[in-house]
């Protein structure tokens, strides 16, 4: 990303919510607002935000290859922190794309919560059947 010094200040943390949770969604909201102001939100920009997930996924894969030394030309060229950082970038890119296609961060947060709840029910059923 480019210079973020023009972003508005982060919202203060609510006492009843975990700091990480608030910071993630606050960061997503601020990033989406910044991207919307800079690039708009036409179909092309939406596609670019979706492609960003694939780009970050490729970087995570490259970090894993570097971590395991699977490329004999490079050997071990990455550490665990690089892999973790790239995986975090995948998550952030996905949340930004989710907020873009759902119409905003509150909608994305709600959809993700419902999706996780649905997956939890499914996992419970799968575990009970095992």
What are these regions (language model features)?
Residues 2-130:
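Flexible "arm" and connector segments at domain edges
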């Amino acid at each position: 990303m480019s210079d973020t010094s023009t972003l508005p200040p982060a919202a203060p943390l609510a006492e009843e919510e975990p700091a990480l949770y608030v910071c993630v969604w606050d960061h997503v909201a601020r990033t989406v607002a910044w991207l919307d102001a800079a690039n708009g939100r036409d179909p092309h920009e939406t596609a670019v935000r979706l492609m960003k997930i694939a780009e970050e996924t490729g970087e995570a894969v490259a970090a894993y290859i570097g971590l395991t030394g699977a490329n004999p030309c490079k050997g071990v060229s990455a550490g665990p922190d690089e892999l973790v950082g790239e995986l975090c970038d995948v998550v952030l890119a996905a949340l930004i794309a989710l907020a873009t296609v759902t119409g905003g961060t509150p909608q994305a947060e709600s959809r993700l919560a419902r999706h996780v709840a649905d997956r939890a029910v499914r996992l419970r059923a799968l575990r009970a059947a095992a």
